[in-house]
């Protein structure tokens, strides 16, 4: 049944260095098969993220100055400018987007995938922008910076007056309007500061890393589900993965927990991502004995499908050989070494258009011997199911990964947050008399498809849509079936694994390993005990010899200490004992992928 549902939905939705400071001067875009209009669509399309009211974000000052938070502070934190867009009047950074509640018309600031998956590098005096590459930004610095600025705005009368003047405009002198704004700000801070407090870890993530699983889990399983005790410190940050080729990989996430073989699975991955960056979701019920009346989300699933389809066309970046040539003799020798020692895990994908699925290799932690914290955090431990107990056969506690996966699946099929349906989609889907065109249309509208898109889909896919809807009904009926007794093996040791994916474009994605603990490809080929134990992250100056970014301290960089929990740079060093010459040969070949 699930296979048919997935298949049907697939048919449905078919000189070597730069400073850590913001890049100035002309930026060149590497050839990755995206024309300028497609690139701007990726940079500016909302996926339903809603951090705070849009007018607040535009008006917000840095906590200790009168400078603009988004114009002045975000570039300091590594977020890239987007001044070329015609669909971005306020010149928001790449991946920061305006979202609108289609029912109330309220506007919000949000983020899309481009904010964390676009980077710039400098090589031989030129600056290149790489789409789909891991950003060198400081997301935790951004979140805490917002907290500091909001608190300063609430507490400093002059700062609040300037804030109110920008937000309220002509109403800024209206005492009642200012009082209402102050109350709204205070109430927002109760939620926001609690979120920051619960998410604060002893050792901040630093540049180029995010604990994506931890943030998504806390947002969905603690805040949205309304169970504070489910919250767990997001203390296993990982390197931001690159996006080219992702659509064709059988599994995604560093620990491979997200299946990715069809468009509904890809949509689930993207819905989980936007829930982690502040999409709204409602999972709570009025009673622990019933399914929530409205399980709704602001995730704009149609837009997410659009963005995913753009990523399918994104090519990996080619090494800029016109600036630094690849040594062909070393490359040939390195290719032979790669075929002997590496290709069994890291398949080779030709540069250019990709249409062929790739079965990624999942490697046991006992074999690769890299830091276990991310895999352990995502796998070990249980969480409360709360109002959704019936979705888990009556179990009050389930493994953390299972809870998150189910909540994301529920969000995928939930009504669109800004639509006010007459009854819950979950109620309707458990009835047997609702396979008409109108009902299917309503479902498609509720998950974010436009009227025009729904009409076009029905013109060609009427029977397939009905089949998908029937499959979906069967799935939901299984969700709301009778509770069954079940136990949780809390102490059962899971088999921890990490993903080994193709390495196309790997040269543009430092630092390396899943936790970003190795600064260059050259060091990745060293034994673990010979790698750098402390280095700085955030510089965009590129070392074309070792293939990585400059690691000296500079303004805006953050220290990476491999002795801290979750930061080990050990492992991935048992696949061949290379001498120095062989290391450089492999580096030269890796540049060419």
Model-derived features: positions:
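Positively charged n-region of N-terminal signal peptides that target proteins for export
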Residues: 1-4
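Periplasmic c-type cytochrome electron-transfer domains
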Residues: 25-593
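N-terminal helix-rich structural modules
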Residues: 6-9, 61
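Bacterial Sec-dependent signal peptides at the C-terminal "C-region" and cleavage site
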Residues: 17-26
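Bacterial N-terminal signal peptides
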Residues: 8-17
